[in-house]
């Protein structure tokens, strides 16, 4: 099923947004997310401690694991031991996880965020240009993903320095309930292979007209914009990021093969560059996915659900139909459109 043929979700977003920002049942909150730190990685510990303090995470939701942080990929066996330890320490009410490192970002053929969410499962992998198992959380109205669906969506607070991590966390906290008036930039590029999401852009404009400023543009990059709230593009490298100002809570990603290889030189831009430029959330695949749109964020879902008051981790996870090969990075609890009474 193509994105634009998902009539059920289109009607849900259209009518929900008719009241602008309706009061949904509570989004995932600080009591329902567990922070996972690697005690053998000093930066991970620093990030985890700062995040727990800023978000007032309950002490029982602070989970410690112990493994060498030297590599980009965990073996299935290594991950199995880590996951068993995490499961043992996870409180029953926890609905989501926040990782506190940029590497490792992969478990064999899965991204590390999907491996923590689903458990390692080769059905979420693919050899060649093939689809993978779909996520039951895609387009879901579930408010308690573990209780209702048996999965804990996971996002990495990814950074290569504490200063970068601190700035990211602060942006997420600052975004809460800010109801920003930024712009959604939807770029159609000359890279036909990576421009496959552009078919959904007219639908974004049609649904969100009058509720958010949407700017569709035929260009290979965006420059000198000071109100970036969403930025979706298909390119291996994205130029001009240093000229942009991202609104706190901003989501930005580029559809390409290896944007999720966060700390390695893959010949393509790492999704970390978005966070370093000021975005609060991004996404990239850790292994060749081919250009199946279902393996990348759907702009209609991502923008629509964010405007409905969902957190970044809920919004982004619900926007990817086949997330097995993709890593979600950012500040999980950022919620620019969540009214205070919705917490």
Question: Over which residues does each language-model region extend?
Answer:
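Cysteine-dependent hydrolase recognition
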Residues: 27-343
């Amino acid at each position: 099923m193509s994105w634009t043929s998902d009539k059920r979700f289109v009607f849900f977003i259209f009518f929900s947004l008719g009241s602008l920002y309706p009061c949904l049942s509570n989004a995932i909150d600080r009591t329902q997310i567990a922070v996972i730190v690697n005690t053998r990685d000093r930066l991970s510990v620093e990030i985890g401690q700062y995040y727990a303090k800023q978000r007032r995470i309950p002490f029982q939701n602070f989970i410690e694991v112990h493994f060498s942080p030297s590599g980009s990929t965990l073996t299935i066996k290594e991950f199995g031991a880590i996951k068993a330890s995490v499961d043992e320490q996870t409180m029953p009410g926890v609905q989501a996880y926040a990782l506190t490192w940029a590497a490792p970002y992969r478990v064999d053929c899965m991204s590390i965020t999907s491996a923590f969410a689903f458990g390692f499962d080769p059905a979420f992998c693919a050899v060649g240009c093939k689809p993978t198992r779909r996520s039951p959380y895609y387009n879901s109205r579930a408010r308690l993903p573990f209780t209702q669906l048996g999965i804990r969506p996971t996002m990495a607070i990814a950074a290569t320095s504490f200063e970068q991590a601190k700035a990211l966390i602060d942006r997420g906290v600052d975004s809460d309930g800010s109801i920003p008036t930024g712009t959604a930039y939807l770029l159609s590029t000359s890279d036909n292979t990576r421009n496959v999401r552009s078919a959904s852009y007219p639908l974004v404009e049609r649904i969100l007209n009058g509720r958010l400023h949407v700017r569709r543009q035929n260009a290979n990059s965006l420059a000198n914009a000071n109100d970036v709230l969403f930025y979706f593009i298909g390119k291996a490298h994205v130029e001009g990021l240093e000229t942009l100002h991202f609104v706190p809570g901003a989501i930005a990603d580029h559809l390409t093969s290896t944007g999720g290889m966060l700390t390695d030189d893959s010949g393509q831009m790492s999704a970390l560059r978005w966070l370093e430029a000021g975005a609060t959330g991004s996404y990239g695949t850790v292994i060749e996915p081919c250009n199946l749109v279902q393996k990348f964020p759907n702009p209609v879902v991502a923008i629509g659900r964010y405007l409905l008051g969902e957190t970044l981790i809920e919004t982004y996870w619900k926007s990817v139909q086949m997330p097995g090969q993709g890593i979600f990075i950012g500040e999980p609890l950022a919620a620019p459109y969540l009214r205070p009474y919705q917490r």
